[in-house]
Amino acid sequence: MVKFRILAAVTLILLTTIGGLAQEQEKTKDEVIAADVSNVLERHVFYTVYDFIAFKVEDGVVTLFGQVTSDFKIEAYKKSILKHVEAVKEVKSEMEILPASTADDTIRYIVAYNIYNDDRMLRYAIANFPKPIHVIVRHGRITLEGVVGSEMDKRLAESIARSVNGVLSVTNNLAVK
């Protein structure tokens, strides 16, 4: 009876360990997929400062989030991920297509130009593609997305965005790293 209990305990430990290893391997696979997806998206020819893409990977399924300026970009991103990232089972999109608007386009261009041409922000202008600060405009309302190097740069980008005529509000989601 004692041998049976010991054997049962060892079996339970082994099964728990194997189950944990399987979950860890799946997690690792998703992490590898996420790194590859990030690479594909960052280098995509259609990814501009006027779009913002986030994603999650769960059991090999990639789900895209964010905003883009044109609907064709979503299909292009999905095709690139499926073509260049092994082990992706499916790509889903929950992305928002920003409304077409001449006024928003004008605001978008001026804000990005002013941010990337400000002497204090030049290090972001010469950064590798894609640029680290993304300017999302919807009905005159700006959302800044991306990453900057300091709290001061975050506030400066917001101040530059607020100074543009036609801007109704600015939401600053820039992360400081």
Model-assigned labels for residue ranges:
Residues V2-A8, T16-K177:
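N-terminal targeting leaders
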